[in-house]
Amino acid sequence: MCHQKLTISWFAMVLLVSPLMAIWELEKDVYVVEVDWSPGAPGERVVLTCDTSEEDDIIWTSDQSSEVVGSGKTLIVQVKEFSDAGQYTCHKGGETLSHSRLLLHKKEDGIWSTDILKDQKDPKNKTFLKCEAANYSGRFTCWWLTAVSTDLKFSLKSSSSSSDSRSVTCGAASLSTEKVTVDQRDYNKYSVACQEDITCPTAEETLPIELVMEAQHKYKYENYSTGFFIRDIIKPDPPKNLQLKPLKSSQVEVSWEYPDSWSTPHSYFSLKFFVQVYRKKEKKGESLLVDKPSAKIRCSKGGEVRVRAQDHYYNSSWSEWASVSCN
């Protein structure tokens, strides 16, 4: 988690009272309050200061209350529940002076909450973020699932700013138009494209890319971390331009090309290919594993030839299938 120091100025601010850094600034005028969710925990004491040189006739309101919640230049809020979070605004004479938004990051039994995102159930450990790269250019896409539909905000970025870390720039998250169904429940899918700032595709990776995704839902804050080498998230795009050339009997020669997105030169960034004859009524057809972009195989009417690709030298994920009919 990136904790940012609070700067004392005439701007609206939160005064850090907890020695455990339980309150920190997420962005301008937005603060995360880390709250112990166990029964009997006292919550966190937050002091808000109005951005004004005036001292008198100041009142405070909250977007969670229809009544005035305090008066004076400072306001003390004991934050324990989500009803204590929200946007606090100071006013004088009908004029808005400044505001601060408080978000809760809850911790229960020593574990930070992970309520916003769906666990995608990696066999070894919890997986909330999944990432894939179509080549070694340093560009990749990450995605996640959530059952939440409204009042969401996501930000994906490098989790470390040290000079020896791999810096990454990510775009804005976008919502897929299609739902993803898991265990008979529909989820929204968000994705974001990222690019490593400095990359050398032919160099061996010695440090992983480390990312943190910050999620906000209404007044709730959570973060999710992931780390990987580009080589471990490679999934080539499918081969393109599949063509069949009839030979004698039912034998055909199938040829294809490398996907446009794959790294070049192909003599260095080689792919291997899995070729399969597929028929709906047959569980398993003839198949071949080849290094070059062509193969001879038997395929009769009603079947199709399918081809998928994998990094030749590293056990990457296989691409999706590309196919051509044998008719």
Curated annotation (Swiss-Prot):
SMART domains: IGc2
InterPro entries per record: FN3_dom, FN3_sf, Hematopoietin_rcpt_L_F3_CS, Ig-like_dom, Ig-like_dom_sf, Ig-like_fold, Ig_sub2, IL-12
SUPFAM superfamilies, A to Z: Fibronectin type III (SSF49265), Immunoglobulin (SSF48726)
Stored CDD domains: FN3
GO molecular-function term, one example from the UniProt record: cytokine activity
Positions bearing carbohydrate: 125, 135, 223, 315
Cystines in this chain: 50-90
Keywords of this entry: Cytokine, Disulfide bond, Glycoprotein, Immunoglobulin domain, Secreted, Signal
Broad class of where this protein is predominantly found: secreted
Cited PROSITE patterns: FN3, HEMATOPO_REC_L_F3, IG_LIKE
Top-level taxon in the UniProt lineage: Eukaryota
Subcellular location: Secreted
Domain Ig-like C2-type intervals: 23-106
GO cellular component, one term: membrane
Signal peptide: 1-22
Sequence ranges assigned to domain Fibronectin type-III in this UniProt record: 238-327
Assembly notes: Heterodimer with IL12A; disulfide-linked. The heterodimer is known as interleukin IL-12. Heterodimer with IL23A; disulfide-linked. The heterodimer is known as interleukin IL-23. Also secreted as a monomer. Interacts with NBR1; this interaction promotes IL-12 secretion.
Family designation: Belongs to the IL-12B family.
Function: Cytokine that can act as a growth factor for activated T and NK cells, enhance the lytic activity of NK/lymphokine-activated killer cells, and stimulate the production of IFN-gamma by resting PBMC.
PANTHER family per record: INTERLEUKIN-12 SUBUNIT BETA, INTERLEUKIN-12 SUBUNIT BETA-RELATED
Protein name: Interleukin-12 subunit beta
